[in-house]
Amino acid sequence: RLLDLASRHGFTCTDVKIFNSKSHWGSCTPRRSINLSLSLMLLPWHLIDYVLLHELCHTIEMNHSDRFWALMDKVTEGKALELRKELKKYHML
């Protein structure tokens, strides 16, 4: 799914790793390696996509600047903040 979203939106990542993280849904390293939590499996598909797109956006903007959120809005069809709020309702196991 990550590679499909990356291709569809023009992102590239160098590596993908799955961890049993209890503190992050995902992260992106400066080398464009994306780390994902196993807990993502508990989320609805649209929120999994949100997290994947969030980390893919970090391959371009390694921060949460206005440019990052503009990019997130572009790839989520203007729903970035709405999806972010919805994700906060979920807790990691």
Regions from the PLM with identified roles:
Residues 55:
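Walker B catalytic acidic pair
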